[in-house]
Each structure stands twice: as structure tokens, then as C-alpha cells.
Amino acid sequence: MANFISLKRNEDILNIIKKQQKIHSNHIVVYFCETNLKKVRLAISISKKKFKLATQRNRIRRLIKAWFIAANVLVESYDIVVLVKPSFIDGSFVLNCDNIKKILQTIISKHKQNKINK
């Protein structure tokens, strides 16, 4: 999972959110959609209204990227948008890492179900 590219264009992020495939937990919401690329494209959205300090937002971004690397789950050909909730700061690194791992496994299982149904 270490091979991911950052999604930067607002248009791309909005297209993923409009497709309405999402999984949520107490601390984050993950929108995803399948693509033809061989790599994962990742966007992390953190609201300035909820997290005032830039250092806090940057730390959250680094933690989320570290989770995706630490999760070590093979998800390919997906665009993923992560929205961070204000309750994010309350969770520990290990708990949130397990949470990301479960979310990625859910994405993989939905992907397998879609392939079976087609």
C-alpha cells in the first residue's frame, strides 16, 4: 500500500464523493471508487474550521498516510478520499490503524462482490 499518489484536483475529489460509495467510522469517512490505474490515488481532506492550526492538520495528514502504509492491505486501482472528523484527535494511533485496516478490507470485499456479480 506504500505506492499511492496524491489526488490534488478538486474536480477529481468531488467526482469520487458524488459516486456515494463510502464507509465511515467514528473518526473518519472514506469515499472510494474503482479506476483503471494500477496505483491507489489518495486525498485527505481536513477542515480548517474544525482544526485551526496548520501543524495539527499536517500531523493528521502524516498519521493517515502512515496508517495506509502500516495497514499493508493490497488495494489497487482505487481512488480514495479521506474526510477527517473532529473526534479524530481522541483516538490512539493503534486503534485508528486497526480502523483503517478494517475499512480497507471492507473496500476489498466490496470489490470482490462487484466482480462476482458482473
Curated annotation (Swiss-Prot):
GO terms for molecular function: 3'-tRNA processing endoribonuclease activity; ribonuclease P activity; tRNA binding. Its EC number is 3.1.26.5. One of its GO terms (cellular component) is ribonuclease P complex. It is an enzyme of class 3 (hydrolase). Pfam families: Ribonuclease_P. The keyword Hydrolase applies. It comes from the Bacteria. GO terms for biological process: tRNA 5'-leader removal. Keywords: Endonuclease, Hydrolase, Nuclease, RNA-binding, tRNA processing. It catalyses: Endonucleolytic cleavage of RNA, removing 5'-extranucleotides from tRNA precursor. The keyword Transmembrane helix does not apply. Gene3D superfamilies: 3.30.230.10. InterPro entries: Ribosomal_Su5_D2-typ_SF, Ribsml_uS5_D2-typ_fold_subgr, RNase_P, RNase_P_CS. Transmembrane segments: none annotated. HAMAP family: RNase_P. Belongs to the RnpA family. Consists of a catalytic RNA component (M1 or rnpB) and a protein subunit. RNaseP catalyzes the removal of the 5'-leader sequence from pre-tRNA to produce the mature 5'-terminus. It can also cleave other RNA substrates such as 4.5S RNA. The protein component plays an auxiliary but essential role in vivo by binding to the 5'-leader sequence and broadening the substrate specificity of the ribozyme. This is Ribonuclease P protein component.
